[in-house]
Design a protein with these regions (language model features):
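Non-catalytic structural scaffold of enzyme domains
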Residues: 1-126
Length: 126
């Protein structure tokens, strides 16, 4: 199957990533999308990194098997626990939302930045 005909896979530990998907649909109207929200195992924040990695890989394996040409991880906890393993395993782009925090933190604009994160994300070296 030509990659232009394959969907972009979205993964989140729940349904919060639907807001990200909504923006992607608006920005990329000619793309197809698959969304997997792991509501059966939410919340991920208090799980061990190994549990989060296993759950994330399982969910993303399904998106991969369904033909996803790229994966967007909308869960920062999943990103911190599994992004390296995912990039090693899948021969496609794997991106996440988490890098947006870094430029905001480095911004020269005065003011405060609020970061809401789970214990698993805060404990991560990312």
């Amino acid at each position: 199957m030509d990659s232009r005909d394959r969907p972009i896979g979205f993964f989140d530990s729940g349904v919060g990533g639907l807001s990200v998907l909504k923006h992607a649909i608006a920005e990329l109207p000619n793309e197809d999308f698959l969304f997997y929200g792991d509501c059966a195992n939410v919340p991920y924040g208090e799980k061990t990194p190994e549990e989060v990695r296993s759950l994330t890989m399982s969910c993303c394996d399904l998106l991969y098997k369904k033909g996803a040409k790229a994966l967007l991880i909308a869960c920062n906890t999943a990103t911190s626990a599994a992004i390296h393993a995912m990039r090693e395993k899948y021969q496609m782009p794997v991106v996440s939302m988490e890098p947006a925090v870094k430029p905001a933190n480095l911004s020269k604009k005065p003011g405060k930045i609020l970061v809401m994160a789970t214990p698993g994300t805060i404990a991560s070296s990312r």
